[in-house]
Amino acid sequence: MRKPHCTEQALLKRRDVIKGGAVVLASAFFPFSIEILNAGSAVAAPPAPSGTGEERILWNSCNVNCGSRCALRVHVKDGVITRVETDNTGDDRYGMQQLRACPRGRSMRQRIYAEQRIPYPLRRVGNRGEGKFERISWEEAFKEIGQRLRGTIDTYGNEAVYLNYGTGALGSTMGKSWPPAATPVARLMNLVGGYLNHYSDYSTCQITVGMPYLYGGSWVDGNSLSDMENSELAVFFGNNPSETRMSGCKAKTLQHARFTRNTRVIIIDPRYTDSMVSVGDEWIPIRPGTDAALSAALAYVMITEDLIDKPFLAKYTIGYDEESLPKGAPAGSSYKSYIQGQGPDKTPKTPAWASRITGIPPARIEKLAREIAGARPCFICQGWGPQRTTNGENISRAIGMLAVLTGNVGIKGGNTGARENAGYKLPMATFPTLENPVKTELSCFNWYQAIDDYKQMTATTAGIRGRERLIAPIKFIWNYAGNCLTNQHGGINQMHPILLDDKKCETIVVIDTTLTPSARYADFLLPSCLNLEEHDWTSDGDSNIAYVIFDNKCIEPLGEAKSIYDICAGIANELGVKEAFTEGRTQYQWLEKLYAESRKAIPELPPTLEEAYTMGVYKRYFPENHIAYKAFRDDPEANPLPSPSGKIEIYSPRLAELAETWTLLPGQAITALPEYIPNPEGAISAERKEWPLQLIGHHYKQRTHSTYGNCWWLQEVAPQELWINPIDAKARGIEFGDRVKVFNGRGISFVKAKITPRIMPGVVSLPEGAWHTPNAAGEDTNGCANVLTKLLPTALAKGNPHHTNLVQVEKA
């Protein structure tokens, strides 16, 4: 008998049947129509308990990629989740505050019972991307995927297999999806020769690569947010923890830090953010992508008015002035020369110069410079929005320079200019994924080039690490718990033909809970468990609190869903490495082993894992605030930075060399100093005559990136809307709630307008993560910003310039 197809035309209705206290699925498929994915009416109500069994309350977590991991108390009756609440234990005092979930985590029941859950293994039929699948058994899936994987390795080598970026499950031990090297998929691949890995991530690519050239190492540390209690002034460049970290511990930490000393908070951002609402004293609107120009002008005032910390600069840095330039640096290449217009560009970085670029009045720039330099101490930090631009690497270093110039590095109440430290962590043992035999890496963003034109990808043209050039195209993609095949990637319309061509990338395996926009490109679509359907634990920390949430298996997996561990074990069996993969253990037995190891480091944990699951949450308070680079500040000779010089490298010889040896595209630049580089499609671009509005994105209460994007409860509470200033709306005849067309040369998206003075004129913002929902003409109908963004990687990090876009907006 021919197996039924799941198509966009012939949709089969889901039925929930309760038997023996467990949810089972009738032999039907969930809707897979792109048009239905986001429709509230398409989401089925959770089933009702059928019996009179006793209700249980079990601990679990919301472990998506918002920066917080929050506790859930899950009410279960007759094998059905009836209600989800959050942490309500203890007295909620500061230092041991409750790990309260936001509306997203509290909507977990709708996510569990969403009609878009993948019911069983599916195999593509027809053309890739067409949305046609047929049901197969797990045995068929394991066998065919194993054969495809072995064939790819035998034909092209292990570098042709890529683990794509996915952050749908973070913080857990067995089920985590990021970083790829920490996942069960990585363990499987490492047992059969390894895989092509990536570096950096979509959240922080430019700052991760760029800012270490200032401080050294692979990641620049910051003081804990709680240390802001010791600050006289805090200056947030694009940092919005009230929205990006609105749940868990951070909201209370931010409030406590702000009001303990009554620290003054200035927020520099194109938007009047929720952080401005909750803790801000003054909003300074700034045009996107111009933070480096503002930083240079602030430095100009500090230098000309002798407000800098000269002893700090002399002792801890190189490259500030001509006398401290490293050997081989050309004359006139110091930071001071650049700022004063004595360098190659001969342009003094005055407040008037910066005002034309940033839109900030010169007098306000002058005042801000004096405020920062005069505060004792000043907490200077940046979120990850400013760096997500075409030249964001330089922006990250330029903001960091303000902390360096004022000597606020390594002291209480100061900071490095980076984002605040994520907090203490508990030493919980993790699932061992073994060493990857393949050492080649590419950027998390430019993997599509390795499908389309791998021969052009070298160390100097594409940032390849581990070898001089790629030796194979990507032919096999693992996409576990991620929506970056398309939805979260830049240039969706340009990505589409690359993914459709199955002669280029021959196999795409999507392992997920939900039929996301990325799932339509799958050759094999495998249903994985949500964390409420398996045992695990989730650990995290924020400022002075570290914790672990023990995730109970609250219900049986819906349909035929399996844990990622069991999925990989099944494929490992086909490849002849199951014993090496499992070491004879089930997932729970692995957790017992890892828990026993964890108790050696944390003896206060309950004696058994079973008791830990009953307890639910373990917290530890660390009374000392974290001070980044304190040891370096106290004794730089004994505790040098991990930079080549051991000091803060204002002038970077390494970047000077890359500037000479790397091949860059027009509009791109790598500079030894943290200079302002105008962005193509930026604030002062000639293209603004045709596309007059700068488009950025922002994190949003409705979703964590794209996760929860199909939950209609959240869509009702926080609908997808384009933020537009009243001045720009009036000029276009747009009224609040109008459906508008947002477009440029890359794509079109339709969305409702939110007219608000909380965004500066000349700038519009779309909340990121909306599910791509194209109509028959290929136009997005759901406010998905990535049909408008670029597919062009940045110069140094080869990262995603998601906030460098010009668009036009008109009433639809």
Q: Can you describe what each PLM-predicted range is?
A:
Residues D274, P517-F550:
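Flexible glycine/proline-rich, aromatic-decorated loop/lid segments
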Residues S563-A612, S706-Y708, W712-W723, I727-A812:
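Long, contiguous, secondary-structure-rich segments that constitute the structural scaffold
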Residues G280-I286, A546-P557:
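Short beta-alpha connecting loops at secondary-structure transitions
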Residues R2-L307, P361, Y480, K730, ...:
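N-terminal export/assembly segments and adjacent metallocofactor-ligating motifs
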Residues R2-H5, W178-I268, A293, A403-Y521, ...:
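Extended redox/cofactor-interaction regions of prokaryotic respiratory oxidoreductases
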Residues E506, K553-A572:
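Phosphate/diphosphate-binding loops
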Residues A331-G332, K336-D452:
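Active-site phosphate/pyrophosphate-binding segments
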Residues T273-A375:
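Long, well-ordered, tryptophan-enriched scaffold segments
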